[in-house]
Amino acid sequence: METATLVAIFISCSLVSFTGYALYTAFGQPSKELRDPFEEHED
């Protein structure tokens, strides 16, 4: 394979894995530990 192809595949896999981790953090098990600043400061 050419170097450009390997770099493109690496960058694509990195972006997909980062997006998956961000979605897991936002909506998965760790989301229960996130605080909601709007809920803390009710008017």
Curated annotation (Swiss-Prot):
Record InterPro entries: PSII_PsbN
UniProt KW keywords: Chloroplast, Membrane, Plastid, Thylakoid, Transmembrane, Transmembrane helix
Principal location listed in the UniProt entry: plastid
GO cellular component: chloroplast thylakoid membrane
Subcellular location per the Swiss-Prot or TrEMBL entry: Plastid, Chloroplast thylakoid membrane
GO biological process: photosynthesis
Topology relative to the membrane: Single-pass membrane protein
Regions that span the bilayer: 5-27
Function: May play a role in photosystem I and II biogenesis.
UniProt family annotation: Belongs to the PsbN family.
UniProt protein name: Protein PsbN
Organism of provenance: Hylocomium splendens (Glittering wood-moss)
Gene: psbN
